[in-house]
Amino acid sequence: MSPSFKHNCTNDHYVVEWASKQAAKADYIVTHYGDRFDIKFLQSRLLYHGLDPLPLPKCLDTWKMSRSTLKLHSNRLASIAAFIGAGNKTPLSGPIWIRAMSGHVPSINYVVKHCEQDVLVLEAVYNKLRRLDGCHPNVQVFYGKPDGCPRCGSEHLESKGYRATQLYVYQKF
């Protein structure tokens, strides 16, 4: 926790600066509804604090993956996670947020634990949905495995027939 946060719990400069540095190092950022909320929120806070805005990050958005490939009653992260068995989000009520924003340490700790669980659920959802994403980057490039799965990098491939284009026939895995 930064000293400025201990003095003023509404000062998010340290968190925003840290998040910006982490995002700038990443090739891709995995989010849920990130293009429509998280990235814009972070950009707004960076400008507010007089920090440089992020270069436009490449997002792998599980909300978009779900919305474009599944037909669910809701595309909220909790709904998708429950549907595919990817863990549970912790509940977070308005009163807890309000207490946390006023500096109530137990509420702040609860929000931190909630966010950590959120990341674990997001990771599990992403790992399941990325197989459905036709625009997912080829992870073989990152793993250096030219004969691996382009979506997860696994070398344990199972042939699933062939796919034809106008010019070529490709084996499906």
Predicted features and spans:
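Conserved DEDDh/DEDDy metal-dependent 3′-5′ exonuclease domain
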Residues: 2-79, 83
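Acidic, Mg2+-coordinating catalytic module of metal-dependent nucleases/exonucleases
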Residues: 79-142
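Short cysteine-rich clusters marking metal-coordination/redox-active sites
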Residues: 149-152, 170-173
